[in-house]
């Protein structure tokens, strides 16, 4: 704080010093001039002292102002230092989070690569399924379609064939002994009647024999057909 005493001027009580106030006929002329010069010097010294005091006071005032400004600067520097420290903490935290995020991103990239590889496999499997579905659509036997359907391959069933719930073809019947002879595949009159008198004639017996032979041959033809279809053996 500035010293206010420095701002108070030095007051010289004896402001006038000349030969009129000195004793006469005592001092030599040179001494009188010396004394008068001393008075002038004292005034000059007082003026310089006052100027120096004023300068010192002004300097102290300026120093006080600078001290206030420096204190403000110190406060601002302290605040800035605190803010910088907070920013450094936040920056360190952010750097840590960035490291974590980079790790998470790397993990997610690996997951995406795995998913993409899995998608390629799924696409391949889907292509296979679509191809199979296309094949099934173009070549299948429906349970509900009423139009005629056909198979290019043999059909094997476990027990029997049925039509409207009624069995029409069953399992093969075994134990049949194959007949011999010539089967009758041509036409014959199933309503053929035979005339037989009270006494058998040769022609009547021959006609009956022929009819019996035709019947046996037709039976053989039917047996052969059943064998060829695998119904008997």
From Swiss-Prot:
* Region (Interaction with tail hub protein), start-end ranges: 2-50
Keywords attached to this Swiss-Prot or TrEMBL record, sorted alphabetically, are: Calcium, Coiled coil, Late protein, Metal-binding, Pore-mediated penetration of viral genome into host cell, Repeat, Viral genome ejection through host cell envelope, Viral penetration into host cytoplasm, Viral short tail ejection system, Viral tail protein, Virion, Virus entry into host cell
Q: What is its main location?
A: virion
Q: Where is this region: Inverted coiled coil?
A: 175-233
Q: Which residues take part in binding Ca(2+)?
A: 63, 66
Q: Where are the Trimerization heptad repeat repeats?
A: 61-67, 70-76, 77-83, 84-90, 91-97, 98-104, 105-111, 112-118, 119-125, 126-132, 133-139
Q: Please give the Gene Ontology molecular function terms for this protein.
A: metal ion binding
* Hydrolase in keyword set: no
Q: Which residues, by range, are in coiled-coil regions?
A: 61-139
The record lists the membrane-crossing segments as none
> What is the residue range of the motif Basic cluster?
216-220
Query: Where is it located?
Result: Virion
Family, according to the entry, reads as follows: Belongs to the Lederbergvirus tail needle protein family.
The record comments on the domains as follows: the N-terminus forms the domain that binds to the tail hub protein and plugs the portal vertex channel, the middle coiled-coil rod, and finally a C-terminus distal tip that is a tight trimer of alpha-helical hairpins.
Q: How does it assemble?
A: Homotrimer. The trimer forms an elongated coiled-coil. The N-terminal tip may exist in a pre-ejection extended conformation, which may fold into a trimer of hairpins only after ejection into the host. Interacts with the tail hub. Interacts with the head-to-tail adapter protein.
Report the protein's function: Cell-perforating component and plug protein of the phage tail machine. Together with gp4 and gp10, gp26 is required for stabilization of the condensed DNA within the capsid by plugging the hole through which the DNA enters. Host cell membrane perforation allows viral DNA ejection. The needle penetrates the host outer membrane. The needle is released and the internal head protein gp7 is ejected to form an extra-cellular channel.
What is the protein name stated in its UniProt record? Tail needle protein gp26
Q: Which organism is it from?
A: Enterobacteria phage HK620 (Bacteriophage HK620)
Name the gene. Answer: 26
């Amino acid at each position: 704080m500035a010293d206010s005493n420095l701002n108070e001027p030095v007051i010289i009580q004896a402001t006038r010093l000349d030969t009129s106030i000195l004793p006469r006929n005592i001092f030599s002329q040179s001494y009188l001039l010396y004394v008068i010069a001393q008075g002038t010097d004292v005034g000059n010294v007082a003026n310089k002292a006052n100027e120096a005091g004023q300068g010192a006071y002004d300097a102290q005032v300026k120093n006080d102002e600078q001290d206030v400004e420096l204190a403000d600067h110190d406060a601002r520097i302290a605040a800035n230092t605190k803010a910088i420290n907070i920013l450094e903490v936040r920056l360190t935290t952010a750097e840590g989070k960035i490291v974590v995020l980079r790790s998470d991103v790397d993990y997610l990239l690996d997951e995406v690569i795995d998913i993409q590889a899995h998608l390629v496999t799924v696409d391949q499997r889907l292509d296979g399924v679509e191809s199979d579905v296309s094949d099934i659509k173009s070549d299948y036997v429906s349970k509900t379609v009423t139009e005629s359907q056909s198979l290019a391959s043999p059909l094997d069933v476990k027990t029997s064939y049925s039509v409207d719930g009624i069995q029409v073809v069953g399992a093969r019947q075994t134990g049949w002994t194959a007949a011999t002879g010539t089967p009758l595949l041509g036409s014959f009159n199933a309503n053929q009647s035979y005339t037989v008198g009270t006494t058998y004639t040769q022609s009547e017996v021959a006609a009956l024999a022929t009819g019996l032979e035709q019947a046996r041959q037709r039976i053989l033809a039917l047996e052969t057909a059943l064998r060829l279809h695998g119904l008997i053996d």
